[in-house]
Structure formats: structure tokens, C-alpha cells
Amino acid sequence: MSIGILGKKLGMTQIYDEKGVLQPVTVIAAGPCTILQKKTEEKEKYTAYQLGFDDAKEKNTANAMKGHFKKVKSSPKRFIREFRANKDENLNVGDAVTVTRFAPGQMVDVIGISKGKGFQGVVRRYRFAGGGAAHGSKSHRRAGAIGMRAWPGRIWKNARMPGHMGDVKITIQNLPVVQVRESENILLLRGSVPGSNGSYLVVRPAIKKPALKK
């Protein structure tokens, strides 16, 4: 498994590919990221790298984290994530990880936090059909009956009901890389990714291969 990169969603736009087809793309400011910690089989029993992205003010950094950054001679970072890696990854603490790890046409997975929608009903949250819209109907957008019989005499857990929607971790798999702009530290991915503009993202090489079309 190869490590990925951390970034920030800038927004969406459209570009033409080499065939003249208009493609919707998401623009991501990816890296450069600093390797803050290296975990090894000998010490932690697995191989991984801890990456930091986006400089933060020292006054807004916890004292414990200040020591962590000072140990590796790095400025404080806002966004820190860990990537599992193969043993043959030859990276060291303090090295920079840039968009050059990716190439056009490569498939990637993107992990982010979805937009928060607040408290929503079942029609919007779970796409329920809703009740009748006629004059005699008294429940247009309600969930309907949720009761059980004498047994079990209760409501099953995880029943779909109104509640908080969004603001959860989402993984979008197998998005193709359209362009890699090394000088600007920009990745262009075809399609949409979770979160609002300015939200942090994790971009990693795709784990699952897309199914072949028959």
C-alpha cells in the first residue's frame, strides 16, 4: 500500500479532455505535506507515516503537539493524518510529500467530511416517499407507523427516523486523476468529493479496482 497526500478542496470547475469532451473536475490543493513521524515494525508492529498539512499558528497549538512538531523541526500543522505503508517505502521524518506521487489517469480514493444539513425529516434524510398530498391527508411528510406487535413490544434499533443529517466521514472511491499541476501543488479529479470548499481531504491511491464493463 502506497501512502497518499493531504489537501484542501478549492471548488469545482470544467475542463475539456483530449477528445474535446467537457469534464466536471474538483480542484484540490494537495500538499506539500511534511512527514512528522515514521512508524516501524520493530517499534509499533506496523509500518506507517504521519503527515501534516497546512501551517497553523503556534499560539493555537496544544503544548503536547508543540513538542511533537519541535522534535521533527517542523512548523505546527492544522491537519494531521496517518497512512499505512509498505516496508519498501523509503521516506524519512522531515521529507516532503508532493503531488508528484500521482499521475494522470490514476485512480484515487478521497476521504472527507460531508456537508452538515442539520436536523432533517425522513423525506430528505432517507428519501421516503411521504404520505398523500390530497386534502384529506393529515401526514404529508411523516415517516408513518413505527410500532411493533406485542412481541417484541418495542422499536428496533436503527429505525430510520428524523435526526441530524450530514457532517460524517465519506469515502468516494475510484476517482480518476485528470491533471497534476506540480508547480501549483494542484490535483484535478473527475467528479465531486465530500465537503464544502475549504474543507480538508485525504487523497490516497485507490484500494479497490473498478469493475470492468461488459
Could you say what each language-model-derived stretch is?
Residues 1-214:
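Extended basic (Lys/Arg/His-rich) segments that typically form rRNA-contacting surfaces
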